[in-house]
């Protein structure tokens, strides 16, 4: 007769040890050594000692959480946000901005095997010109409006946010009060806020039709606050309620965009980044320049003010159309935009028949594997690669170095202070 036994529950003893942190990784975690391997501890800074509890023990590394901190680093700051540690938006408000930048630069230098020559940064607070706040109205409870908890889908009710542009942060209580007064609160999905050169935008996502009374209340609110209001009943539909089409200024150009178009969150760093790209490429009046993953022309259009000709290639048709509109609006007749998928075989795409002296690329996190071979074939004198993922940047850089290019400048872009996001830009020159 078969006999069945219940497996005994495995009891894991949570080991408490005392460690001293000697480094900070780019995500803001303290790094100590234990049993010959790296031990990652959120919330601890270099030179701090603590009693910690091992929570995960792998072959190559381990993780722990702080039980009791024994001393404070001089680099420790008091977080400005009352939601820090619960809200998933920021991870490093307890770290001085200088240490944040040093740790990110060190991580970038290790990956790229090259010193970081520049740190491009702006104000560490009030820098976000765009934010999306989740909305939820549980039965018989007040409206929830805020960001997601770290590692959770739960909403943290945000009353203030010190990294938001001041104009947006000041609006939060009034937006909450307006939305809470609507009859259709249970049908609200999220609200997006954008601070553009043209003023403040509010995009409200709702999952069922709003009543005429709710629409009227929202319109009155938009007029009283002087903002442009857009309703998004479906993912692809945008209804203008009030205000004008948004725009922002960049390097002497006025760039219009749709409320849902991607624009860089940090305006100050974006302006410096574009200026540095123009400088590094050393754009001259006779140059033919290629801009890959160009979006709506954040780099393309400023490049066109200096070069003989510029071609921008982008996979999102709406952004391509906006780039063309902005070229016409700004009187730039030497720029051409192509809508193409750069993850496919680019050699058969019409733009690829041209020759180019200089290339700029700004891919998404997946990097630019699909176009690296063609870029190398073009043999441009200079290449500027803007990256939001240092791992794929390092991979793509290896292909360029193996083809005879050299990294001559490396910059860390502090686009998202107080977070673990690490952005960068590199200048490659053909040797």
UniProtKB/Swiss-Prot annotation:
Question: Which residues does the entry assign to the active site, renumbered to this chain?
Answer: 388 (nucleophile)
TRAM domain span: 10-68
The UniProt GO MF terms for this protein read:
4 iron, 4 sulfur cluster binding; iron ion binding; RNA binding; rRNA (uridine-C5-)-methyltransferase activity
- EC code(s) of this entry: 2.1.1.190
> Which Pfam families does the entry mention?
TRAM, tRNA_U5-meth_tr
Keywords, A to Z, come to: 4Fe-4S, Iron, Iron-sulfur, Metal-binding, Methyltransferase, rRNA processing, S-adenosyl-L-methionine, Transferase
Where is S-adenosyl-L-methionine annotated to bind? 264, 293, 298, 314, 341, 362
For the biological process aspect of GO, one term held by this record is: rRNA base methylation
Enzymatic reactions:
uridine(1939) in 23S rRNA + S-adenosyl-L-methionine = 5-methyluridine(1939) in 23S rRNA + S-adenosyl-L-homocysteine + H(+)
Q: Which residues bind [4Fe-4S] cluster?
A: 81, 87, 90, 161
Q: Which InterPro entries match?
A: 23S_rRNA_MeTrfase_RlmD, MeTrfase_TrmA_AS, MeTrfase_TrmA_CS, NA-bd_OB-fold, SAM-dependent_MTases_sf, TRAM_dom, U5_MeTrfase_fam
HAMAP family linked to this entry: 23SrRNA_methyltr_RlmD
What role does this protein play?
Answer: Catalyzes the formation of 5-methyl-uridine at position 1939 (m5U1939) in 23S rRNA.
The entry's family comment says:
Belongs to the class I-like SAM-binding methyltransferase superfamily. RNA M5U methyltransferase family. RlmD subfamily.
Listed name of the protein = 23S rRNA (uracil(1939)-C(5))-methyltransferase RlmD
Q: Which organism is it from?
A: Salmonella typhimurium (strain LT2 / SGSC1412 / ATCC 700720)
- Report which gene this protein is encoded by: rlmD
């Amino acid at each position: 007769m078969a006999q069945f036994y219940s497996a005994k529950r495995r009891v894991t003893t949570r080991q408490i040890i005392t460690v001293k942190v000697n480094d900070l990784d780019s995500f803001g975690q303290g790094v100590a050594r234990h049993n010959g391997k790296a031990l990652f501890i959120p919330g601890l800074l270099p030179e701090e000692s603590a009693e910690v509890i091992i929570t995960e023990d792998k072959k190559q590394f381990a993780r722990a959480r702080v039980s009791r901190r024994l001393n404070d680093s001089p680099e420790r700051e008091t977080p400005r946000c009352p939601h820090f540690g619960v809200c998933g938006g920021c991870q490093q408000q307890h770290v001085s901005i200088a240490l944040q930048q040093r740790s990110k630069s060190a991580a970038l230098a290790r990956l790229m095997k090259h010193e970081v020559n520049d740190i491009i940064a702006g104000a560490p607070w009030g820098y976000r010109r765009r934010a999306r706040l989740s909305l939820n109205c549980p039965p018989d409870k007040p409206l929830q409006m805020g960001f997601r908890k770290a590692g959770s889908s739960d909403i943290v009710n945000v009353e203030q946010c010190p990294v938001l542009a001041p104009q947006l942060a000041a609006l939060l209580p009034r937006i909450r009060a307006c939305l809470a007064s609507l009859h259709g609160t249970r049908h609200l999905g999220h609200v997006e806020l954008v601070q553009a050169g043209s003023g403040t935008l509010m995009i409200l996502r709702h999952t069922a039709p709003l009543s005429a009374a709710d629409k009227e209340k929202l319109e009155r609110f938009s007029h009283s606050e002087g903002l442009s209001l857009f309703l998004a009943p479906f993912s692809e539909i945008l209804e203008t309620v009030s205000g004008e089409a948004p725009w922002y200024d960049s390097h002497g150009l006025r760039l219009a965009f749709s409320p849902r178009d991607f624009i860089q969150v940090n305006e100050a760093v974006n302006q410096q980044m574009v200026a540095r790209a123009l400088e590094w490429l050393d754009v001259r009046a006779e140059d033919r320049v290629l801009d890959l993953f160009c979006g709506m022309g954040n780099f393309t259009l400023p490049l066109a003010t200096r070069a003989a000709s510029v071609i921008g290639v982008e996979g999102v048709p709406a952004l391509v159309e906006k780039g063309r509109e902005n070229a016409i609006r700004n009187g730039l007749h030497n720029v051409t935009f192509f809508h193409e998928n750069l993850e496919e075989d680019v050699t058969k795409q019409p733009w690829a028949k041209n020759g180019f002296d200089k290339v700029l690329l700004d891919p998404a996190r997946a990097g630019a594997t699909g176009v690296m071979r063609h870029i190398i074939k073009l043999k441009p004198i200079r290449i500027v690669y803007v990256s939001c993922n240092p791992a794929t940047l390092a991979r793509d850089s290896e292909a360029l170095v193996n083809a005879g290019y050299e990294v001559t400048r490396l910059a860390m872009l502090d686009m998202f202070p107080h977070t673990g996001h690490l952005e960068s830009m590199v200048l490659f020159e053909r040797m």
